[in-house]
């Protein structure tokens, strides 16, 4: 039963596999990026994270543990000198995997594995607010403001025309009343009794 046995065999014995990954970790820390197959790159990431975590501790015991893995002393000195400043408070994820394509000989998938520094992450965080701040700048435009002003101007005119239209029927209703008012004085008040007198004189006397 294969319990509590991490890692992949990769078709090699344990000693061959350990020697291969020790060489690969040394090359990765020395050149900061190497190309290998996908399966080896995923396993190499575990080795690199373990070594860098030990280097961030910086004590003597951690240095001796790294010396048992990395083959070159100058690479170990460089790693311990830059680990705390370069990786800072980053907890794991010290490497980046980028798939390149197929290898020409056997069409094996090839991956580029490289170290990630703390400065790259801080630069990305600084660039993000700049993009968001640049978006609201081009929103105000003169033609749009003119269109909005032109669209807003007819509204008061329509509001003014509505009371004017409402006042027109009132004026028209008042006009006939004004015209009808002067017609009443045309009938003189004195004529009515005259007609009554004339009618009484012309009427024949009653016979008994």
Swiss-Prot record:
Report the Pfam families cross-referenced here.
Ribosomal_L17 (PF01196)
List, as start-end ranges, the regions of compositional bias called Low complexity: 151-179
Q: Which GO terms describe its biological process?
A: translation
Please give the superkingdom of this protein's source: Bacteria
Gene Ontology cellular component annotations, sorted alphabetically: cytosolic large ribosomal subunit
Q: Where is this region: Disordered?
A: 122-208
GO MF terms here are: structural constituent of ribosome
Annotated keywords: Ribonucleoprotein, Ribosomal protein
Which protein family is it in?
A: Belongs to the bacterial ribosomal protein bL17 family.
Oligomeric form and interacting partners: Part of the 50S ribosomal subunit. Contacts protein L32.
Q: What protein name is recorded for this chain?
A: Large ribosomal subunit protein bL17
Which organism does this sequence originate in? Desulfosudis oleivorans (strain DSM 6200 / JCM 39069 / Hxd3) (Desulfococcus oleovorans)
Q: Which gene encodes it?
A: rplQ
């Amino acid at each position: 039963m294969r319990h509590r046995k991490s890692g992949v065999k990769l078709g090699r014995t344990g000693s061959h596999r350990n020697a291969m990954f020790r060489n690969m970790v040394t090359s990765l820390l020395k050149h900061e990026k190497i190309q290998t197959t996908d399966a080896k790159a995923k396993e190499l990431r575990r080795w690199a994270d373990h070594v860098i975590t030990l280097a961030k501790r910086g004590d003597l015991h951690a240095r001796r543990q790294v010396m048992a893995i990395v083959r070159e002393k100058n690479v170990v000195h460089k790693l311990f000198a830059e680990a705390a400043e370069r990786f800072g408070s980053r907890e794991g994820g010290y490497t980046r995997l980028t798939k390149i394509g197929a290898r020409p000989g056997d069409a094996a998938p090839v991956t580029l594995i490289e170290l990630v520094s703390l400065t790259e992450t801080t630069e990305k965080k600084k660039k993000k607010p700049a993009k968001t701040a640049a978006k609201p700048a081009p929103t105000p435009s003169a033609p749009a403001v003119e269109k909005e002003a032109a669209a807003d101007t007819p509204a008061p005119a329509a509001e003014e025309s509505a009371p004017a239209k409402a006042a027109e029927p009132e004026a028209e209703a008042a006009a006939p009343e004004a015209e009808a008012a002067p017609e009443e004085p045309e009938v003189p008040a004195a004529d009515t009794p005259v007609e009554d007198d004339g009618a009484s004189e012309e009427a024949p006397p009653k016979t008994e």
